[in-house]
Amino acid sequence: MKKTLSILMSFGLLFSANLKNEAISFPSKVISSEGNNINVGKLTEGSTVIIITIKSPSCPVCQTQLIRIGKQLDNFNKCNVTFLVLSPGTSKEVHQVKLTTEFPFPFIPNDDLLISKALGLLLNPQQILPSIIVLNDNLTINWIQKGRNNIYFGDDELYDYLDCDNWI
């Protein structure tokens, strides 16, 4: 019974994509793993802001996803996007993921997990539910894809949602 419940919960996490929840907002200002202040509100004025959450700094599937998206940046750049990566862990741990993946966008340490909790993405006291979030200009969630595993990353779904091929 426990195994069946676990499988059903996994499918629930895997296929809970495209949910809208206008009541939740991302913080307007955050600090990167390099100590830089980031005005997220300002970023949304000039581009579509996409938040990639990773389960933990040691999550290999999450790192693979960042590398996959990094290889597709020419396609994503067609629709004027910028990424932020939200991860549990210290600045040092999170920055190491940035260096390892060579993902060229800011990484946001969420050591206290307050942002993840506010977004409803807390898996446990040390981990975030891996997700992709597209923000509205007012920092609320426009689109969210929850869940990730070694055969399902969600980046294709994001690209389809953004419809970058039809941008002028």
Task: Show the residue positions of the predicted features.
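Structural micro-motif
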Residues: 104-105, 123-133
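Sec-dependent N-terminal signal peptides
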Residues: 4-13
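Structural microenvironment flanking redox-active thiols in thiol-disulfide oxidoreductases
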Residues: 63-102, 113-117
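Thiol-/selenol-based redox modules, centered on thioredoxin-like
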Residues: 129-168
